[in-house]
A protein has these predicted regions:
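NAD(P)-dependent dehydrogenase/reductase Rossmann-like domain
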Residues: 2-15, 264, 347, 370, ...
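Conserved SAM-binding strand-loop segment of SAM-dependent methyltransferases
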Residues: 60-67
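Beta-strand-loop-alpha-helix segment that lines the small-molecule cofactor/substrate pocket
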Residues: 78-85, 89-136, 151
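C-terminal capping/lid region of NAD(P)-dependent oxidoreductase domains
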Residues: 127, 154, 363-380
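Rossmann-like NAD(P)H-binding beta-loop-alpha module
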Residues: 139-167, 173
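Rossmann-like dinucleotide-binding domain that binds NAD(P)(H)
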Residues: 168-251, 255, 349
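C-terminal glycine/acidic-rich active-site capping loop/insertion
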Residues: 221, 229-232, 260-345, 380
Length: 380
């Protein structure tokens, strides 16, 4: 059985969810409100004006401006963190240590030590941690997973991902960010589809961004492209990432090459992916929706934006073509993993490994492609 794919109606307990950060995070409010096993208990936002506006719009009465006050609330079972990148790890660790289950938007962390502390806090608290990686719950990924599970792919031989996105117009902390520091959208499907974690990575940077952007993080590269080896497997993968100063339509792509069938993502938006069958047969495919894997009450959220649909849907949702219908799958996976007391997909070890690929890939690029080994925190 696929984890979280079937709703168990016998479960009667509801999980009290608190959402932290109400930009992208507000997308999940109605999903939790309608999930049969969740209670959308509280929201948290520093801006009181925004906090009250969102709270009134969705009828959420429990509101916090202080994250510290929120995690002290004994009624909060789990927090879903959607704050700026530099806060992800510290807030996740604090929430775990406060006895809360944690779902956190990507990336999980920005340093190897933060990764270690997330794993340690999850283990010591006994609470679940799940990085809310959209791509591994997108309809495209679920389609390739189905090809894998039914044996149509054959033996997986190679995986490749790319995330090409011009971040002009995003909040200032994105300016000059090392490309591989936000690489989970291309790394995660490559490792997820082989049920693996990376052992080591080598990366090269390419091109140069403006001096003003370089000054922010000390990263000169427009592009970074990395190869990684999957631990305890004979599979390797390649990922490419850029953030600024290149002409390219937005693309999050994932290719999977099998001995019998291979899947290649479409080159442009609104085109269809391609299947290569047996080497010579090529066919375009229409990707089905996978809402049937969800409780009926939240199925419609695979195909529509749920927050301020008319004007102000979050930019990541617009540019990412709705994140492949992943949002209700992510919420359902998190809720059911906690209530069933099972590992989520991704679990804490997968979450930090997939994030560390990008962290160490950038370090490798600064060292002209030096091979970087990823620590294995399963013994922490």
């Amino acid at each position: 059985m696929v984890p979280g794919s079937v709703f168990h109606s016998k479960m009667s307990r509801k999980l009290n969810i608190a959402i932290v950060g109400l930009g992208f995070g507000a997308e999940f409010i109605p999903i939790y409100q309608r999930h049969p096993q969740a209670n959308m208990y509280a929201i948290c936002q520093r801006s009181k004006e925004k906090l009250d506006a969102v709270g009134q719009a969705f009828g959420v009465e429990k509101r916090y401006q202080s994250f510290e006050d929120l995690i002290r609330d004994p009624k909060v079972d789990a927090v879903h963190i959607n704050s700026p990148i530099h806060l992800h790890a510290s807030q996740s660790i604090a929430a775990l240590r406060a006895g809360k289950h944690v779902a956190c938007t990507v990336p999980a962390c920005t340093t190897i030590e933060e990764a270690r502390e997330i794993v340690k806090a999850s283990k010591e608290s006994g609470k679940k941690y799940m990085m809310m990686e959209t791509v591994v719950w997108s309809r495209e990924y679920l389609y390739v997973r189905e090809l894998r599970d039914t044996g149509r792919l054959g033996r997986i031989q190679f995986v490749r991902g790319s995330h090409l996105q011009n971040m002009d117009g995003w909040p200032g902390y994105w300016e000059g960010l090392p490309p591989m520091h936000y690489a989970t959208h291309c790394v995660s499907p490559c490792l997820g589809i082989v049920n693996g974690e990376a052992e080591y990575v080598s990366c090269l940077g390419s091109g140069r961004i403006s001096e003003a952007r370089i000054a922010k993080y000390g990263s000169p590269f427009s592009f970074e492209t990395a190869h990684f080896k999957v631990r305890n497997q004979d599979v390797a993968g390649e990922v490419t990432r850029y953030l600024f100063e290149a002409a390219r339509q937005y693309q999050e792509s994932f290719d999977c090459y099998g001995s019998q069938t291979s899947f290649e993502w479409q080159l442009t938006e609104h085109d269809d992916p391609v299947l290569h069958v047996g080497g010579e047969k090529v066919e375009k495919v229409k990707i089905p929706d996978y809402a049937h894997l969800l409780p009926e009450a939240i199925r419609e959220f695979t195909t529509k934006c749920v927050y301020d649909l008319a004007e102000n849907a979050h930019l990541s949702f617009i540019q990412g073509s709705g994140h492949g219908g992943s949002h209700p799958h992510l919420a359902h996976e998190f809720v059911t993993a906690v209530l069933e007391n099972r590992p989520s997909f991704p679990d804490v070890h997968q979450s930090v490994n997939w994030t560390m690929v990008g962290i160490l890939a950038h370090e490798s690029a600064l060292r002209a492609g030096e091979k970087m080994h990823l620590p294995n925190f399963r013994g922490v």
